[in-house]
C-alpha cells in the first residue's frame, strides 16, 4: 500500500514495533527515510539499519534498541511535526528544544537532514520534521 506521508508511516512503524517489543521493523526505503534512520542511529535511538530487497520493493530493516531486563524501549515517543497539509518551518534562531535538550528535533535543511543541535551549530533553519525523545 502506498503511503502519502512516508515519514509518518516510518514513525508509526517504529512506534508500533517498540510497543510490541519487536527486535526489528521494516520501512519502505526512500531518500528521506534513509536520512532520518541515519540520524536516529547516530543519536543512539536505534541499533542498525540494513537494506532489504524483495523483488521491486526496497525496504530498510531497522534494528531497535532496548534497555534493562524489562526491555524498555530507548525511544519513549516519536511525534510528527510538519505534515503534508501543514508544513512547519523554523529559522535558525527559533529552532525547538525537545524536553529541554533531552530529546531531539529532526530538521530538513538546505544541507540535508540533521538534528536541531547540528542545525544550531551550522546556523541553519529548515522544516521541522519530527520530535524524538
From Swiss-Prot:
Q: Any idea which UniProt keywords this protein has?
A: Ribonucleoprotein, Ribosomal protein, RNA-binding, rRNA-binding
Keyword field contains Methyltransferase: no
The answer to keyword Methyltransferase applying to this record is no
- Alphabetical list of Gene3D superfamilies matching this protein: 3.30.1370.30, 3.30.1490.10
Supply the SUPFAM superfamilies for this chain: Ribosomal protein S8
Quaternary context? Part of the 30S ribosomal subunit. Contacts proteins S5 and S12.
Q: Which gene encodes it?
A: rpsH
Residues in a coiled coil are none
One GO MF term attached to the UniProt entry: rRNA binding
Q: Which GO terms describe its cellular component?
A: ribonucleoprotein complex; ribosome
Organism lineage reads as: Bacteria, Bacillati, Cyanobacteriota, Cyanophyceae, Nostocales
Gene Ontology terms: biological process:
translation
User: What InterPro entries does the record point to?
Assistant: Ribosomal_uS8, Ribosomal_uS8_CS, Ribosomal_uS8_sf
Q: State the name under which the record lists this protein.
A: Small ribosomal subunit protein uS8
Q: What does this protein do?
A: One of the primary rRNA binding proteins, it binds directly to 16S rRNA central domain where it helps coordinate assembly of the platform of the 30S subunit.
**Domain of life the protein comes from:** Bacteria
Give the similarity note.
Answer: Belongs to the universal ribosomal protein uS8 family.
Amino acid at each position: 500500500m502506498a503511503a502519502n506521508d512516508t515519514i509518518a508511516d516510518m514513525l508509526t512503524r517504529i512506534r508500533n514495533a517498540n510497543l510490541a517489543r519487536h527486535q526489528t521493523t521494516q520501512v519502505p526505503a526512500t531518500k528521506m527515510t534513509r536520512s532520518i534512520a541515519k540520524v536516529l542511529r547516530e543519536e543512539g535511538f536505534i541499533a542498525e539499519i540494513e537494506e532489504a530487497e524483495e523483488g521491486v520493493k526496497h525496504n530498510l530493516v531497522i534494528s531497535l534498541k532496548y534497555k534493562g531486563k524489562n526491555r524498555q524501549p530507548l525511544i519513549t515517543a516519536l511525534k510528527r511535526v510538519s505534515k503534508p497539509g501543514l508544513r512547519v518551518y523554523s529559522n535558525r534562531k527559533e529552532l525547538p528544544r525537545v524536553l529541554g535538550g533531552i530529546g531531539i528535533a529532526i530538521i530538513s535543511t538546505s544541507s540535508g537532514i540533521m538534528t536541531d543541535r547540528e542545525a544550531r551549530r551550522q546556523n541553519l533553519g529548515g522544516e521541522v520534521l519530527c520530535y524524538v525523545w
